[in-house]
């Protein structure tokens, strides 16, 4: 734990120590009226919902600029990527302004907004709006490696799991009843799953690589109070990947609900997994927005939409394999965010094997040109 995270973990938001620290940040990075602010004029409010960060809204009764203080909990590589992406999107008007960054955190513009939740993300109109906002982010050229990252991240996660002493993994689903999965999976077999999913992806979708969010759950989408515009936030997993992986990641996560405070802290809906209600509308909105952005008149819009639906369905189980590999290691690390990581990993593995045959069929159909 970094010293700054330890400081904000051990001291209450209304403590003198925290008040003095946020005034110091205000003076250092914003200047202006913060130089004259007194401690009794400052309010620090904890913002709930961040698993990767501690977040605080800092305001004063004066004209000093309010700000959002973000204290990182992630490792250096995630923090670096998130900060780079945040700065780029800030400069291009696609996110909050960056006020400053320091070892272990940053200060940014506070956008009066609501965070979408697991219920509203299922609203057909909101789902269409999310689909329509994606293309402008996918069109950005970000100065990082253009190599697709998702499969390498899976391998890195498995290696970390093994380095922590992890071995063969039992799969006993808790919130889903799918039964296509093996009862136990070896690390060698998991690496093989990753390898052939990567092989299929290389053969079919190598020309669809764009810059992706890779973690667009509802909690990472803001709706601005002033304009109702949707803004994508929290880019620590941002990297280049196939666009279908990014879109399927969002769609698959609409079936996962993390709001239950009782164990295991996650519920995956089989109904929303097997019959996603907004897949058609979401893909229509994406295709229309993408064509508009590129000033392109589609020769066959229906075919474009159908192909994108097929693309999303292909990657759907791959997103579950991605998160299952990632959270296995968190379980060994006793990562505490209110979610049982072993339950999450096992349920996601069950979803992966349940949907794997559909992906195999899509692969075979696309190779034959019949999908």
UniProtKB/Swiss-Prot annotation:
Magnesium is among the record's keywords: yes
One cellular component (GO) term of this entry: cytoplasm
GO BP: any one term: phosphatidylethanolamine biosynthetic process
Coiled coil: none
Protein family membership: Belongs to the choline/ethanolamine kinase family.
Entry-linked InterPro entries: Kinase-like_dom_sf (IPR011009)
Gene Ontology terms, MF aspect: ATP binding; choline kinase activity; ethanolamine kinase activity
Organism of derivation: Caenorhabditis elegans
Cofactor(s) this protein cannot do without: Mg(2+)
Identification of the protein by name: Choline kinase B1
EC number(s) on file: 2.7.1.32
Keyword line: ATP-binding, Kinase, Lipid biosynthesis, Lipid metabolism, Magnesium, Nucleotide-binding, Phospholipid biosynthesis, Phospholipid metabolism, Transferase
Catalytic activity entry: choline + ATP = phosphocholine + ADP + H(+)
Keyword field contains Kinase: yes
